[in-house]
Amino acid sequence: MNSTSQSRKWLSLYPKDYLPDLTPEGTNALDHLRKTVQLYSQNPALYYFDKVISYRELDEMSDAFACALKELGINKGDRVALYLQNIPQFIIGQFGIWKVGGIVVPLNPMYREKELTYYFRDASV
Protein backbone atom coordinates (compact mmCIF):
# COMPACT_ATOMS: atom_id res chain seq x y z
CA MET A 1 0.00 0.00 0.00
CA ASN A 2 1.34 3.44 -0.86
CA SER A 3 1.06 6.47 1.42
CA THR A 4 -1.95 7.87 -0.47
CA SER A 5 -3.98 4.69 -0.10
CA GLN A 6 -2.96 4.41 3.56
CA SER A 7 -4.09 7.95 4.34
CA ARG A 8 -7.21 7.72 2.14
CA LYS A 9 -8.54 4.27 3.00
CA TRP A 10 -11.93 4.98 1.46
CA LEU A 11 -10.34 4.71 -2.00
CA SER A 12 -10.36 0.92 -1.63
CA LEU A 13 -14.18 1.09 -1.63
CA TYR A 14 -14.41 2.80 -5.03
CA PRO A 15 -15.26 0.75 -8.13
CA LYS A 16 -12.23 -0.43 -10.09
CA ASP A 17 -12.96 1.89 -13.05
CA TYR A 18 -12.93 5.04 -10.90
CA LEU A 19 -9.81 7.12 -10.89
CA PRO A 20 -8.10 7.44 -7.49
CA ASP A 21 -7.60 11.16 -8.03
CA LEU A 22 -11.02 12.76 -7.94
CA THR A 23 -9.84 16.33 -8.31
CA PRO A 24 -12.84 18.22 -9.68
CA GLU A 25 -12.79 19.44 -13.26
CA GLY A 26 -15.07 22.33 -14.03
CA THR A 27 -16.42 25.13 -12.00
CA ASN A 28 -19.80 24.06 -10.66
CA ALA A 29 -22.08 21.13 -9.89
CA LEU A 30 -23.64 21.17 -13.38
CA ASP A 31 -20.20 20.81 -14.96
CA HIS A 32 -19.56 17.85 -12.68
CA LEU A 33 -22.91 16.27 -13.53
CA ARG A 34 -22.30 16.64 -17.27
CA LYS A 35 -18.82 15.13 -17.00
CA THR A 36 -20.10 12.25 -14.87
CA VAL A 37 -22.92 11.56 -17.34
CA GLN A 38 -20.33 11.36 -20.14
CA LEU A 39 -18.09 8.98 -18.22
CA TYR A 40 -20.51 6.93 -16.12
CA SER A 41 -24.01 7.40 -17.56
CA GLN A 42 -25.26 3.99 -16.44
CA ASN A 43 -23.76 4.14 -12.95
CA PRO A 44 -26.06 4.78 -9.99
CA ALA A 45 -26.44 8.44 -9.08
CA LEU A 46 -29.18 8.06 -6.48
CA TYR A 47 -30.49 5.25 -4.34
CA TYR A 48 -33.91 5.65 -2.74
CA PHE A 49 -35.29 2.59 -1.01
CA ASP A 50 -35.43 -0.05 -3.78
CA LYS A 51 -35.16 2.49 -6.64
CA VAL A 52 -31.87 3.28 -8.38
CA ILE A 53 -31.54 6.32 -10.65
CA SER A 54 -28.57 6.40 -13.04
CA TYR A 55 -26.65 9.54 -13.91
CA ARG A 56 -28.25 9.49 -17.37
CA GLU A 57 -31.73 9.28 -15.85
CA LEU A 58 -30.91 12.06 -13.39
CA ASP A 59 -29.72 14.24 -16.26
CA GLU A 60 -32.81 13.48 -18.36
CA MET A 61 -35.25 14.06 -15.49
CA SER A 62 -33.59 17.33 -14.53
CA ASP A 63 -33.70 18.38 -18.22
CA ALA A 64 -37.45 17.69 -18.25
CA PHE A 65 -37.91 19.69 -15.06
CA ALA A 66 -35.83 22.54 -16.52
CA CYS A 67 -38.10 22.59 -19.60
CA ALA A 68 -41.18 22.75 -17.36
CA LEU A 69 -39.65 25.64 -15.43
CA LYS A 70 -38.95 27.49 -18.68
CA GLU A 71 -42.56 27.00 -19.75
CA LEU A 72 -43.59 28.54 -16.42
CA GLY A 73 -41.42 31.58 -17.15
CA ILE A 74 -38.50 30.80 -14.83
CA ASN A 75 -35.32 32.44 -16.12
CA LYS A 76 -31.72 33.07 -15.14
CA GLY A 77 -31.48 34.69 -11.73
CA ASP A 78 -35.01 33.75 -10.63
CA ARG A 79 -35.29 32.20 -7.19
CA VAL A 80 -37.17 28.92 -6.96
CA ALA A 81 -38.14 27.38 -3.63
CA LEU A 82 -37.74 23.63 -3.19
CA TYR A 83 -40.06 22.56 -0.39
CA LEU A 84 -39.23 18.87 -0.33
CA GLN A 85 -37.96 16.20 1.99
CA ASN A 86 -34.67 14.43 1.41
CA ILE A 87 -35.91 12.57 -1.69
CA PRO A 88 -34.68 12.15 -5.29
CA GLN A 89 -37.05 14.85 -6.53
CA PHE A 90 -35.04 17.38 -4.52
CA ILE A 91 -31.85 16.57 -6.45
CA ILE A 92 -33.74 16.45 -9.75
CA GLY A 93 -35.33 19.81 -8.97
CA GLN A 94 -32.05 21.35 -7.86
CA PHE A 95 -30.28 20.41 -11.10
CA GLY A 96 -33.30 21.49 -13.15
CA ILE A 97 -33.33 24.91 -11.51
CA TRP A 98 -29.60 25.31 -12.08
CA LYS A 99 -30.00 24.29 -15.74
CA VAL A 100 -32.28 27.28 -16.38
CA GLY A 101 -29.93 29.53 -14.41
CA GLY A 102 -32.23 29.75 -11.41
CA ILE A 103 -31.27 30.07 -7.78
CA VAL A 104 -32.31 27.20 -5.52
CA VAL A 105 -33.95 28.19 -2.25
CA PRO A 106 -34.10 24.96 -0.22
CA LEU A 107 -36.84 24.89 2.39
CA ASN A 108 -37.31 22.30 5.10
CA PRO A 109 -40.80 20.74 5.13
CA MET A 110 -40.65 20.90 8.91
CA TYR A 111 -40.68 24.71 8.84
CA ARG A 112 -43.79 26.29 10.25
CA GLU A 113 -45.70 29.14 8.63
CA LYS A 114 -43.73 31.84 10.47
CA GLU A 115 -40.40 30.37 9.34
CA LEU A 116 -41.58 29.92 5.75
CA THR A 117 -42.80 33.51 5.64
CA TYR A 118 -39.40 34.69 6.84
CA TYR A 119 -37.50 32.66 4.23
CA PHE A 120 -39.86 33.64 1.41
CA ARG A 121 -39.33 37.31 2.21
CA ASP A 122 -35.60 37.01 2.86
CA ALA A 123 -34.95 35.11 -0.38
CA SER A 124 -37.48 37.10 -2.43
CA VAL A 125 -39.22 33.90 -3.49
What residue ranges belong to the model's regions?
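Conserved ATP-dependent adenylate/AMP-binding module captured primarily in the ANL superfamily
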Residues: 109-125
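Short, contiguous pre-domain boundary segments
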Residues: 10-21
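A short N-terminal helical cap/helix-turn-helix that marks the beginning
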Residues: 2-8, 22-44, 60, 64
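Anion (oxyanion) recognition and catalysis
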Residues: 98
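Conserved AMP-binding/adenylate-forming core of the ANL superfamily
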Residues: 23-25, 42-87, 91-95, 112-117
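Structured binding elements
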Residues: 101
